[in-house]
């Protein structure tokens, strides 16, 4: 529990998205019916360690930033964007809930973090009212989710197009989205992507009704639901999924190997 809390605390400061895995571990822990007393003790240890690590790193990093780079609280208040900014961008129809430079420029027009937060909240509520329930659901499933999960290159070809390194290199022409040979890249990545997701779905289906074998991969399934919910609420981008690729590969392998095992037993 202590080790997990330390790792989660460090992860929180590096990048918040993988922190979803820590939350998935906690949820999976409580979905198990046995050993409630031990689970409560373990959770308490994790939370105390997590809180301590986050606080310690936060204090040290703030002091380091001020001493080495002159980044004071006043500078942060002037330039730092609140979390509400990315939620606001996630509701922009023009970008299908993705990054929007207009929103970035708009948030930057306000002088303090408090003003930016209040204005972001106002825009968020206004955009939700404009959607309505039915249109918002349609926006999620037909705009945001395809923009998130419908890119087999995880936006890598787009970023390479923006800042190409050795643009005339044959490999770059294969990888960037407007390259002369990019179709070969798409054939490979989409084949891999479909096989990957088919294995993940297979793993979930084969786990139904078999609780005994479900537990090892339960954390991965909960984390996948978590990242999907995160992308719905946040500014969506397919590159956020890259962090979870190792876990997705393990889940796909579980699906294929379990299927093979079941077929072997049936014979």
Residue ranges of predicted features:
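Hydrophobic/aromatic-rich transmembrane helices and adjacent perimembrane loops
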Residues: 8-27, 192-193, 237-257
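A juxtamembrane structural motif centered on a specific transmembrane helix
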Residues: 205-217, 249-267
């Amino acid at each position: 529990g202590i080790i997990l809390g330390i790792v989660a605390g460090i992860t929180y400061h590096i990048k918040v998205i993988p922190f979803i895995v820590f939350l998935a571990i906690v949820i999976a822990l409580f979905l198990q019916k046995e050993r409630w007393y031990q689970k409560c003790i373990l959770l308490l240890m994790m939370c105390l360690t997590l809180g301590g690590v986050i606080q310690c790193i936060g204090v040290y990093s703030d002091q380091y930033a001020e001493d080495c780079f002159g980044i004071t609280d006043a500078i942060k208040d002037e330039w730092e964007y609140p979390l509400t900014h990315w939620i606001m961008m996630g509701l922009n129809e023009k970008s299908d809930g993705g990054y929007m430079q207009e929103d970035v420029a708009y948030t930057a027009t306000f002088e303090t973090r408090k003003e930016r937060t209040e204005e972001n909240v106002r825009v968020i509520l206004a955009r939700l009212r404009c959607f309505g329930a039915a249109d918002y659901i349609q926006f999620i499933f037909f705009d945001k989710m395809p923009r998130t999960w419908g890119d087999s290159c995880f936006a890598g070809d787009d970023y390479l197009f923006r800042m190409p390194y050795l643009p005339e290199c044959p490999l770059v022409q294969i990888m960037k989205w407007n390259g002369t040979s990019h179709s070969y890249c798409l054939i490979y990545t989409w084949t891999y992507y479909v096989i990957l997701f088919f294995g993940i779905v297979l793993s979930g289906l084969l786990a139904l009704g078999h609780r005994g074998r479900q537990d090892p991969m339960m954390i991965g399934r909960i984390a996948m639901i978590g990242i999907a919910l995160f992308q719905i609420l946040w500014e969506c981008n397919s590159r956020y999924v890259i962090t979870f690729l190792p876990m997705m590969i393990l889940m796909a392998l579980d699906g294929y190997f379990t299927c093979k095992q079941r077929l072997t037993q049936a014979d």
